[in-house]
Amino acid sequence: SHRGQLAPQACVDVAERSVASGFDDSVAYGRERFRELVTSPQAQALRHAFFAERVATKPAGLSADEVVPIRKAGVVGAGTMGTGIAMCFLNAGIPVVLVEQNETVLASSVETVGKTYRNDVAKGRIAEAMQRTRCDALTPTLRYESLHDCDIVVEAVFEDMGVKQQVLASIEENLRPDALIATNTSFLDIDALAAGLRRPENVVGMHFFSPAHIMKLLENVRGARSSPRALATIQALGKRLGKVAVMVGVSDGFVATGCWRDAPASATSCWRRERCPSR
């Protein structure tokens, strides 16, 4: 159970009551506690979350017929985020081309991948053969040209509009015309990033959360010119990667970062007004 939930303690109370009293009294007490719980704001919130998670992963207007098979992926940027994203694909059995301009950073990323999988073997999470398979499926390189046969490339470089625009242009220059390009930006305007490209319909957002190979949430961002084909593909890809893939629109910080940004401001406002959240 999660901290603060009412139902687990109610279950304990009902069980204790059933031991200490007769059958009829226990049934009546259990019914009373159930009515309290099922009509509580907490129950309403939990039901909303349950159905919202399922609706959010199935955006309207997208068809499974438009999903493009992803047989090989590219990741540009071998920092913490790029390394984690590469492992997301490797974990799903998708070979990865990892592009990084800094040779030292690239070597460090490859070592991190190997160390992570060695630890997984030591802890019994994967077999040694799986470790070798995943490591062999990673192709580290300094050259954008190595992306030529990728079905999708995820950009995961520094959060700077100019830097990302240059990187995206280099990616597009070396990709097939039908390949998809995803940016991992956490707050930049996807439409502005795609504006200078020849095929903006192939550009989408895939906002992973760090550590990318562990965190389940994935914000797939719908740009103004993102094609239904591109959007349907990243939704299906998110599921294949084992993520809760939620489609969001272009906005400042999208959804998760926007909530995170606003929460401290709300808390500070309460503190300044000497207001407790319970009030």
List each model region and its residues:
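Intrinsically disordered, low-complexity segments enriched in small/flexible residues
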Residues: 1-69
